[in-house]
């Protein structure tokens, strides 16, 4: 067995899927990320309006043209059509050109981060998909749909539990639960003390973020939230400085929580070690 270089300190259990070469792994993450990103463009368009992601088939929002396979190739179709419907030439919107490559890039980063603990890659790709969708929706509508959060918690918990069993570290299951509880309690206290200064969608999102960070180490949950608050504060101050936001202007916080979580996945343990060493 190989010793993990991912920072988890766990052995990598070899299964056929886990023996894939690194270059092939990265290629598969790019392709999978683009396909999932294409699906997420449907999610961010329909879920905020209460629609189904399954039906009806994708159509042009202007002329109703049903989109065929050639209209749905990630990135390529958008570029070939120059961001317009091939029949009525109405704008398709920029979402595909942001969401699809962003999802693919983050999938690749997760593959690199968990290269020697590959059983965790599917779980953290689920997190990426949820965070990309919620970030886009929050920026557009200042809402974090509970359906996406709950699906993320359910699927993520199962995927993380499976990963813990595959790497033969079942204790990570309770670590996951502890991380979720820490994040939920922390955000609930902030929500209560701020008297509405934070949305309840942020509170619902907290256990999802906490369980993923807790699976790595419950000690990095608070740093992850801290990174998010710092990023949010910096942007909020910058917006006020350029007169784009007043003190009571609502600033979507979900994207900053997402950013803080991603940062903590990569450097959270190093941050904790640095603080404890001082």
Question: What annotation goes with each model-predicted range?
Answer:
Residues 11-48:
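Long, highly hydrophobic alpha-helical transmembrane signal-anchor segments
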Residues 12-26, 108-122, 161-175, 213-220, ...:
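Helix-coil boundary and interhelical linker segments in multi-pass alpha-helical membrane proteins
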Residues 26-31, 97-101, 121-125, 150-151, ...:
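Hydrophobic alpha-helical transmembrane segments
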Residues 40, 44, 106, 110-114, ...:
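Alpha-helical membrane-inserting segments
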Residues 40-95:
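Membrane-proximal soluble regions of multi-pass membrane proteins
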Residues 89-166:
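Intramembrane alpha-helical segments
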Residues 133-233, 272-278:
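Functional transmembrane core segments of multi-pass inner-membrane proteins
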Residues 237-263:
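Interfacial loop-to-transmembrane junctions
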């Amino acid at each position: 067995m190989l010793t993990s270089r991912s920072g988890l300190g766990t052995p990598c259990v070899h299964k056929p899927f886990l023996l894939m070469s690194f270059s092939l792994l990265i290629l598969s993450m790019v392709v999978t990320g683009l396909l999932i990103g294409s699906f997420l463009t449907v999610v961010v368009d329909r879920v905020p309006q209460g629609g189904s992601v399954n039906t009806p088939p994708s159509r042009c929002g202007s002329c109703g043209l049903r989109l065929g396979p050639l209209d749905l190739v990630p990135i390529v179709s958008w570029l070939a059509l120059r961001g317009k419907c091939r029949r009525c030439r109405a704008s398709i919107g920029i979402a595909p050109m942001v969401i699809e490559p962003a999802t693919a890039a983050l999938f690749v980063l997760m593959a690199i981060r968990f290269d020697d603990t590959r059983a965790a890659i599917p779980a953290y790709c689920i997190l990426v998909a949820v965070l990309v969708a919620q970030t886009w929706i929050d920026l557009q509508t200042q809402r974090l749909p509970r359906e996406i959060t709950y699906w993320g918690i359910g699927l993520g918990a199962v995927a993380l539990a499976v990963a813990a069993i595959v790497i033969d570290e079942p204790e990570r299951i309770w670590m996951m639960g502890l991380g979720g509880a820490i994040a939920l309690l922390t955000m609930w206290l902030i929500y209560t003390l701020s008297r509405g200064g934070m949305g309840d969608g942020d509170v619902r999102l907290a256990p999802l973020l906490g369980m993923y960070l807790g699976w790595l180490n419950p000690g990095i949950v608070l740093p992850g939230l801290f990174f998010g608050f710092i990023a949010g504060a910096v942007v909020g101050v910058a917006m006020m400085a350029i007169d784009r936001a007043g003190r009571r202007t609502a600033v979507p916080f979900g994207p900053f929580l997402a950013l803080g979580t991603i940062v903590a996945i990569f450097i959270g343990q190093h941050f904790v070690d640095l603080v404890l060493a001082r």
